[in-house]
Regions:
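Aromatic-capped interface at the extracytoplasmic side
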Residues: 23-39
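Conserved catalytic scaffold of divalent metal-dependent phosphoesterases
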Residues: 57, 114-190, 196, 213-222, ...
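Membrane-embedded segments
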Residues: 50-126, 130-134
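Short, surface-exposed loop/helix-turn segments at secondary-structure junctions
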Residues: 204-216
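Active-site acidic short loop of glycosyltransferases
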Residues: 46, 76, 103-104, 167-168, ...
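N-terminal secretory signal peptides and thylakoid transit peptides that target proteins
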Residues: 1-18
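Membrane-cytosol interface motif
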Residues: 43-51
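His/Asp/Glu-enriched short active-site or ligand-binding loop at hydrolase and phosphoryl-transfer sites
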Residues: 199-203
């Protein structure tokens, strides 16, 4: 009987200790513990660039600047941002000031929070253009010496023609919502998305506890879709709660 009581006590203490460790990690460690993931999609890649997503800037200047410094240290050919700079328009000026520190052409698309915040998009366009890139709200650019066709889709519907891949180029499509990959009949060399945050909390051997709308099965990582390979970045920031578990913020270095 004593052994049973002792074992139960140890189990309770171990459970409490484990819960404390998980809570500490999820609240104070992982949200700021940015990792760099490398994704090689070709045996002989000719382009090396960075994707990051879902900054959700809320005034956390030091964290955001450390992300930009990390991106610059990687010396990519160009940078792709897949939506959600902010949640509130009041944070946009400071967020754009920080983003303007990127030292290579930056291309991006809006996310749902960028629209919901009613932020002045003219300022966003100017910021991205100043880096040598562009904000691709249903737009596209031929970049990398005419070798890459970079497209951004912000809306779907009859009033918004879908971009056309170009032959003999690498065709890369930026979308915010991963589930939109199901809507394209064209074939792309790569689709990039954000929005999901990877679920923010991922249970080992199970996956995300919850994901937002328009994610479906494309919650995190590389997927094969009818439109081509889709990579879903887990983002930098968080919403609505400042927690991450088993789902660190990520800067993705892609070779294609």
């Amino acid at each position: 009987m004593k052994l049973k009581k002792f074992t139960r006590r140890r189990f309770i203490l171990a459970s409490l200790f484990t819960s404390l460790l998980v809570a500490t990690d999820a609240r104070y460690i992982e949200p700021n513990w940015v990792k760099t993931r490398r994704l090689r999609l070709s045996n002989n890649p000719s382009h090396r660039f960075v994707q990051f997503s879902d900054l959700h800037y809320k005034g956390d200047r030091a964290h955001a600047k450390s992300v930009i410094n990390r991106i610059n240290s990687l010396s990519p050919d160009f940078v792709c941002f897949t939506g959600d700079i902010i949640e509130e328009a009041k944070f946009l000026p400071e967020a754009l000031e920080i983003l303007s520190g990127i030292k290579t052409p930056m291309y991006g698309i809006p996310g749902n929070h960028d629209y919901w915040s009613k932020a002045p998009f003219d300022d966003i366009f100017k910021c991205f253009t100043a880096t040598g890139g562009a904000f691709l709200e249903d737009d596209q650019r031929i970049i990398a010496g005419g070798k890459v066709n970079l497209m951004g889709v912000a809306h779907l519907g009859p009033n918004h023609p879908l971009p056309a891949p170009k032959p003999e180029m690498k065709n890369i499509l930026l979308i915010h919502y991963p589930a939109w990959a199901k809507e394209f009949n064209q074939k792309f060399d790569l689709l990039l998305a954000g929005h999901s945050h990877g679920g923010q909390v991922r249970i080992p051997f199970y996956g995300p506890v919850i994901v937002p709308f328009l994610v479906d099965e494309y919650d995190l990582g590389l997927f094969q879709t009818k439109a081509g390979p889709l990579y879903v970045n887990p983002g930098i920031g968080w919403f609505p709660y400042p927690i991450r578990f088993n789902c660190r913020p990520e800067i993705t270095v892609i070779e294609i």
